[in-house]
Amino acid sequence: MSSVLKTFERFTIQQELQEQSDDTPVPLETIKPTIRVFVINNNDPVVRSRLLFFNLRIIMSNTAREGHRAGALLSLLSLPSAAMSNHIKLAMHSPEASIDRVEITGFENNSFRVIPDARSTMSRGEVLAFEALAEDIPDTLNHQTPFVNNDVEDDIFDETEKFLDVCYSVLMQAWIVTCKCMTAPDQPPVSVAKMAKYQQQGRINARYVLQPEAQRLIQNAIRKSMVVRHFMTYELQLSQSRSLLANRYYAMVGDIGKYIEHSGMGGFFLTLKYGLGTRWPTLALAAFSGELQKLKALMLHYQSLGPMAKYMALLESPKLMDFVPSEYPLDYSYAMGIGTVLDTNMRNYAYGRSYLNQQYFQLGVETARKQQGAVDNRTAEDLGMTAADKADLTATISKLSLSQLPRGRQPISDPFAGANDREMGGQANDTPVYNFNPIDTRRYDNYDSDGEDRIDNDQDQAIRENRGEPGQPNNQTSDNQQRFNPPIPQRTSGMSSEEFQHSMNQYIRAMHEQYRGSQDDDANDATDGNDISLELVGDFDS
């Protein structure tokens, strides 16, 4: 039997790594469009600032094609480079498009009509066509300019410092909209918190803030252009310098890159952090064994992908689908339950997915609450802690946990309650019990008339829900709350694996019956000792 299990472990790992074989066929080269990118060989701040505004207008233009916008983005992202023509070669590594570099020397009469280099093959008609694109600004932009301040384009940027100020401000906004361009394009393109952070740090000048519509158009252009995202990935790798003496631009790119790394892989890394990182004995459940092998294979698979693995979402890599939490739903549900107790930042993460198992989520919550005072034996041994030190630490953690709660009440962290999150009465030292019974859900739309009776009346609401008068103890007590709260079994010295597994099975069965009892009194509660039925209780989508 052991040989079968070892073979299964090797098979699971090989199944994830087999796509990395060296004998895989070379993909067929597809037809590539030609993208024209304007570059400047001199460092004149006046000409470079004009090229910056020209590229912004091409991105906003009503009549510009996707290739025009991609070329304008590449030129915009290369403006800080002293040698734009050489820097743009990074985009030539992309298999998505062919890059045509067009050298220009300036603009005619402070307009958006470019002056091509003498060696350029750009015709006069093409020059006039690009000028028309730059002038065709959408009506959704106020004052026919991408900036909030309508006189920014009239400024004279005759100093390098002034040009770099506007250049870095615009580029940082482009990098900010990149953070969610692939994972959440329906949300506002710019995070208010990120904008406030970089303005406070002096990396974005408030005078050069773009209009929200301009930020949205830049995000759409980045989302639709694979070659631009390839170029930005190369820039992110260049910013990962081990030296602390980096130039200002790449220091900013490296900072914003932390928000882009592992985008779309939050479920995988949070499962590793809270599910495996805590190393609590609940992981010994037999139901977790198969998914633990899957997580082990995924960790090896991630390491084999190299440094580009952090940007799989930005690169639209199909390998990102290997790491979705639906491949390990029980471990994911258990880890999310732990995370909601230990980390307040988890409230900002949308973990309520269709594959979230309620019972294992509850198991994670109960485990985290009962293990908050537990001591890691390995770390305690390294620190030389005695048994008295461990007991004192556990007591301190328990006091701190109770002191943070309202007196005589325990919070409910029900992820399925939505806007109806509430507190349930109970003693401060009791373990709270989740109640998914919809009869206990407070409603605000069940009134007798459309007049003054629709105003929320706490006393009437309490009587309707059989909760007594406001300020009085709750009269409605479910059977679940009256039942005992079994402690999570702990594996003691001398306990065999079978005994510990049997104890955990009994605990899961008790939890299951406890939560299900209030929903269906006629349900068949008879379960086999070796086969625990974990059914979803209630409607998750409600």
UniProtKB/Swiss-Prot annotation:
Ntail: annotated span: 404-542
Keywords associated with the record: Capsid protein, Helical capsid protein, Host cytoplasm, Ribonucleoprotein, RNA-binding, Viral nucleoprotein, Virion
Domain of life: Viruses
Region (P protein-binding 2) residue spans: 403-494
Main location: virion
Residue ranges of the region described as P protein-binding 1: 295-402
Pfam families attached to this UniProt entry: Paramyxo_ncap (PF00973)
Biased composition (Polar residues): 472-498
Binding site for RNA: 180, 194, 259, 349, 353
Chain ranges passing through the membrane: none
InterPro entries from the UniProt entry: Paramyx_ncap (IPR002021)
Chain intervals with Basic and acidic residues compositional bias: 440-468
Molecular function GO labels: RNA binding; structural molecule activity
Region span, Disordered: 402-498
Annotated compartments: Virion; Host cytoplasm
Region (Ncore): 1-403
Region of interest: Homomultimerization: 1-294
One term under GO cellular component: ribonucleoprotein complex
Function, as annotated: Forms the helical nucleocapsid (NC), protecting the genome from nucleases. The encapsidated genomic RNA serves as template for transcription and replication; encapsidation by N is coupled to RNA synthesis. Forms the encapsidation complex with the phosphoprotein protein P. Before encapsidation, the newly synthesized free N protein, so-called N0, is chaperoned by P.
Subunit (UniProt): Homomultimer; forms the nucleocapsid. Binds to the viral genomic RNA. N0 interacts with the phosphoprotein (via N-terminus); this interaction allows P to chaperon N0 to avoid N polymerization before encapsidation. Interacts as N-RNA template with the phosphoprotein (via C-terminus); this interaction positions the polymerase on the template.
Assigned protein family: Belongs to the paramyxoviruses nucleocapsid family.
Domains as described in the record: Ncore is globular and carries the regions required for self-assembly and RNA-binding. Ntail is an intrinsically disordered monomeric domain in the C-terminus.
UniProt protein name: Nucleoprotein
